[in-house]
Swiss-Prot record:
Organism: Sulfurihydrogenibium sp. (strain YO3AOP1)
First-tier enzyme category under EC: lyase
Catalytic reaction annotation: 5-O-(1-carboxyvinyl)-3-phosphoshikimate = chorismate + phosphate
Pathway where this protein functions: Metabolic intermediate biosynthesis; chorismate biosynthesis; chorismate from D-erythrose 4-phosphate and phosphoenolpyruvate: step 7/7
A molecular function GO annotation: chorismate synthase activity
Presence of the UniProt keyword DNA-binding in the record: no
Family recorded in the similarity comment: Belongs to the chorismate synthase family.
Quaternary structure (record): Homotetramer.
Binding site for FMN: 128-130, 251-252, 296, 311-315, 339
Enzyme Commission number(s): 4.2.3.5
Protein function: This reaction introduces a second double bond into the aromatic ring system.
Name of the protein in its database record: Chorismate synthase
Originating gene: aroC
Cofactor remark from the record: Reduced FMN (FMNH(2)).
One of the GO biological process terms: chorismate biosynthetic process
Length: 390
């Protein structure tokens, strides 16, 4: 089974991921992974850290002469900011009082993590809880995208809202997914409509002046996914559940919906479901996609559509702070302040692409085998033909 573990602290020496179950005979380049890492770092409203880090990956195992071996793949991304934190984040030696965090930030892992793991210096919590961890998720996601793209599956994302500033749904319904993606790639905020950046940037600038941070909503999709990934047979084999968990695991994500999601609760049954049609050329298909490509916990051949809501980042600017309590003195105190973003919704959308890619790649390998990619592709092609002939 395809799986990965990652490790590393936000200001430690490096971030590492080990991927197990990745098939052999897949062509891999660091350039492809680095391209995805660069996409994660883009976005108007990001903090000063993005000016320091220019993430690039090192492959330490599992690849020889650009071809995967079927053995575990080890990826490393060095933290360039580590040189400024060597004393504070030293592996060995005596502890230091420098840059201690004693006032937990509401909305972050600080306080609960400190209680759970027995630390008063909450830096021991926030360093791992930080969204910097998603760097390796994107690197792993790049490997998964390589598999998916080789069998015609395309994954993308775009931002629908930041704070109260929204893209009207009617504005994008007539635009193809390809154009939405291309527009998002050329937007500093991953907006699917051209010409909207400036008004959104002005809104973000105002939030910065007010010392605020902003959340938002993004949409991630997958096209040309085969019918029948996932299963209705057990609660934990339903693919919509796996996708929702993967997206919810991204820092600051507080809500996920698939297809029309919560809107379906307001519709009568006659308007909520996607009617079924058939043609010899297309096989079975739908004219609508309210289900978001998933029925009964399985893919139905339509595009997978997932939306996620990201809360505002808990770290506020220095001239505005939330009320907290010092964990040592128990006295009221302003919450700790760290260098942070005003908004990271565009970056979260890219991370969500990677998580969706991982879940789909894992399902593909579970259904069609996971040893040799050359053989796996042959099975997938035959299966697609069987589906068309059904």
């Amino acid at each position: 089974m395809l799986r990965f573990l990652n490790a590393g602290e936000s200001h430690g020496p490096a971030l590492t991921a080990i991927i197990e179950g990745y098939p052999s005979n897949v062509k891999i380049t660091t350039d492809r992974i680095n391209k995805e890492l660069a996409r994660r770092q883009k976005g108007y409203g990001r903090g000063g850290r993005m000016k320091i880090e220019k993430d690039t990956v090192e492959i330490l195992s599992g690849v020889r002469f650009g071809i995967t071996l079927g053995s575990p793949i080890t990826l490393v991304v060095r933290n360039k900011d580590w040189e400024n934190w060597t004393d504070i984040m030293a592996i060995e030696g005596d502890s230091t009082n420098k840059r201690q965090i004693l006032e937990p930030r509401p909305g972050h892992a600080d306080l609960t993590g400190g209680i759970k793991y027995g630390f008063y210096d909450l830096r021991n919590i926030l360093e791992r809880a930080s969204a910097r961890e998603t760097t390796t998720r994107v690197a792993v996601g790049a490997l998964c995208k390589i598999l998916l793209e080789d069998i015609g599956i395309k994954i993308g994302s775009y931002v629908l809202s930041i704070g109260e500033k929204k893209i009207d749904k009617s504005e994008i319904e007539s635009i193809s997914y390809e154009d939405r993606f291309n527009n998002a790639e050329n937007s500093e905020l991953r907006l699917p409509i051209l010409g909207k950046d400036e008004e959104f940037k002005e809104y973000i600038d105002k939030a910065k002046e007010d010392g605020e941070s902003l959340g938002g909503i993004f949409e991630v999709y997958a096209l040309n996914v085969p019918v029948g990934l996932g299963s209705y047979s057990q609660w934990d084999t339903r693919l919509d559940g796996k996708i929702a968990q993967a997206i919810m695991s991204i820092q600051a994500i507080k809500g996920v919906e698939i297809g029309e999601g919560f809107n379906l609760a307001y519709l009568p049954g006659s308007q909520a479901h996607d009617e079924i049609f058939y043609s010899k050329e297309r096989g079975f298909y739908r004219k609508t996609n309210r289900a978001g490509g998933l029925e009964g916990g399985m893919t139905n051949g339509e595009p997978i559509i997932v939306r996620a809501a990201m809360k505002p980042i808990p770290t506020l600017m220095r001239h505005k702070s939330l009320q907290s309590v010092n964990v040592i003195t128990k006295e009221p105190f302003d919450a700790a302040k760290e260098r942070s973003d005003i908004t990271a919704v565009p970056a979260a959308a890219v991370v969500a692409e990677s998580m969706l890619a991982f879940v789909l790649a894992r399902e593909i390998l579970e259904k069609f085998g996971s040893d040799n990619w050359i053989q796996i592709k042959e099975r997938i092609e035959k299966y697609r033909q069987d589906v068309l002939n059904y």
